[in-house]
A protein has these predicted regions:
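Conserved kinase catalytic-core helix
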Residues: 6-66, 70-73, 86-103, 109
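Hydrophobic transmembrane helix bundles of membrane-integrated enzymes that assemble
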Residues: 70, 74-98, 118-119, 126, ...
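Short, solvent-exposed secondary-structure capping/transition elements
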Residues: 7, 37-40, 163-168, 210
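Conserved short submotifs of the Hanks-type protein kinase catalytic core
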Residues: 1-4
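All-alpha amphipathic helical-bundle segments outside canonical DNA-binding/catalytic cores
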Residues: 205-215
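Active-site acidic catalytic loop and adjacent metal/ATP-binding pocket
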Residues: 93-145
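Active-site activation/catalytic loop segments of kinase-like enzymes and analogous catalytic loops
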Residues: 127, 135-201, 216-223
Length: 223
């Protein structure tokens, strides 16, 4: 069963999800280890550049397209649940400035490691991934990349609650331009699962919190 269905609709306890996160951590580690001999100074520079294209350039492109279609002004301050926030352009610039371009983790990249592309086999107690990207940000066939992107995609599901949003488990009201009331419907169990994830998940020397700028940009790239 896909993890997004389990996460949103099932009632599996936090200790089940700790096991899932350990499977994912092992999967990412294996993807780094099995490709270590393929990474060199030449292709690491290429991979570094394509990683930047995949996160930063794609976000800017998608946001600009959205602005043209919606006539929204991304330069004005926003408000969420009564809290004054910076403009969305300021948020984008801040996230880009906080990406650590020296902390790449190169390996075999899935490229879309969201919960809907991860299956859990209860009989074998294994995860199985489907629908890998297989191309880089420029459209070239490649299975190598920066695995920080894969971890950010998992963040997207666990911390960003992307699958809850897609399933309609939220309430959103826009009272005026970029002034929102927003609630995602979760229980205390999900909050505990998020805490376990943040405390236990690792990619090399990185924790999920280190990838929050990329995670935010992933959401903005989906506008």
């Amino acid at each position: 069963m896909p993890l997004n269905e389990i996460f949103v609709h099932a009632l599996n306890p936090p200790f089940f999800w700790l096991k899932i996160f350990k499977h994912l951590e092992k999967f990412l580690k294996n993807n780094v280890d099995c490709s270590a001999q393929l990474i060199n100074n030449k292709n690491s520079k290429i991979l570094s550049n394509t990683a930047n294209l995949l996160v930063v350039d794609k976000t800017k492109k998608r946001v600009n397209e959205y602005i043209e279609q919606s006539s929204k002004d991304f330069n004005i301050p926003t408000k969420l649940n009564g809290v004054d926030l910076p403009s969305l352009n300021d948020v984008i610039d801040d996230c880009i400035s906080k990406i650590d371009n020296k902390s790449h983790v190169f390996g075999v990249l899935h490229g879309d490691l969201c919960f809907s592309n991860i299956l859990y086999d209860t009989r074998s107690d294994r995860i199985k991934v489907i629908d890998p990207r297989g191309i880089d940000a420029e459209g070239n066939f490649s299975y190598l990349g920066d695995l920080r992107y894969d971890l950010a995609k998992i963040n997207h599901s666990v911390i960003g609650l992307y699958d809850h949003i897609v399933s309609g488990a939220y309430d959103l009201t826009e009272s005026n331009d970029l002034n929102f009331e927003f609630e995602i419907f979760i229980d205390e169990r999900i909050t505990k699962i998020q805490k376990i994830y943040l405390e236990n998940m690792k990619l090399s020397h990185l924790a999920p919190f280190n990838l929050m700028p990329e995670t935010i940009l992933l959401f903005l790239s989906m506008l």
